[in-house]
Amino acid sequence: MPFFLPSNGDYMSAWIKMIEDHEAKQELKEVFNLARTPHGTVDNVMRVHSLRPSTMKGHIVLYKSVLHDETNTIPKWFQETISSYVSILNNCTYSLANHWKNAIHLIDNTEKSDAIKKALDKKKPEEVFTGKELAILKYSEKLTKNPSEMKEEDVQELKKIMFQTAKSWRPIKSYAISIMLTELLMV
């Protein structure tokens, strides 16, 4: 059974059977409860794992450890911006729709969010970002588009520009990787 999500007039589908709450057995019900949003829903990006609750649980654990870890010092609006840019690079309208909606809310400045979105759509973050933020976006771009070309120097350069400790560095690498994994799981 496919699911459809409107995104700018287009529809995205995944031809993966998804189990609804009322059909779920106990193990899946427990994992659904872990995955519930503050509104009480289970996002489709999680529900596509419903045939294999263990993968849904793994996705939830990875997601929460990256985004909600107390050592993550990256502002939430920028986390959503990174996710949006990776979604653009991967042509994933589903992921983009979700992350950009959150980014707009967190940025809370229509002029700024419009300028950011325009630059990201053109794949030119340098039009609105500089310094650490631009370095993160460029790193995420290379990791997303050309992972086999990543070199130790890429990591060291970003660490030098941005962070003093590995503890602060971990979220960026994990975040970019988790977004890519999420999008791979949607295929």
Where are these regions (language model features)?
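Hydrophobic alpha-helical segments
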Residues: 2-187
